[in-house]
């Protein structure tokens, strides 16, 4: 039996690869659209909301990037979030432990948000993206998480 690379593989190699990068929920939310490794558009959410260091979901920045690239959310090959929540949480715990007991109040204040929201960003991001694209979650491309310093 022959491998099934043939025509479909060739067609994919000739098409463009569109990747949407997202930073959100910490500070300075933003989005960037890459096509075949080249930056097509990038924007910070604060440029649209006029809220300094806006940490919200970057819906307006995403819309801008998609419009500039003349693509829709479902046309993307990948959506990539700038960090891995579990890795970030581990760094946070290590930092608190290394300074303990000094950061106890800060630690106690940040834990509820981490345990309720930030550890489950994949669900939140997919829901926000589906709402933004007016589509079902299943219609969205693969959502990936990059190492912070690689994104």
Label the model's feature ranges.
Residues 2-151:
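Short acidic/glycine-rich loops and adjacent helix/strand connectors
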């Amino acid at each position: 039996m022959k491998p099934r690379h043939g025509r479909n593989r060739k067609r994919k190699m000739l098409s463009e690869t569109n990747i949407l990068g997202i930073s959100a929920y910490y500070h300075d939310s933003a989005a960037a659209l890459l096509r075949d490794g080249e930056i097509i558009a990038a924007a910070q959410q604060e440029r649209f909301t006029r809220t300094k260091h806006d940490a919200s979901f970057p819906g307006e920045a995403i819309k801008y990037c998609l419009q500039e690239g003349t693509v829709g959310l479902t046309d993307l090959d990948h959506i990539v979030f700038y960090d891995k929540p579990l890795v970030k949480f581990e760094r946070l715990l290590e930092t608190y432990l290394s300074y303990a007991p000094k950061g106890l109040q800060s630690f106690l204040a940040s834990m509820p948000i981490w345990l309720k929201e930030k550890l489950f960003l994949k669900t939140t991001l997919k829901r926000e993206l589906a709402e933004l694209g007016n589509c079902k979650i299943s219609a969205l491309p693969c959502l990936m998480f990059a190492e912070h310093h690689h994104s």
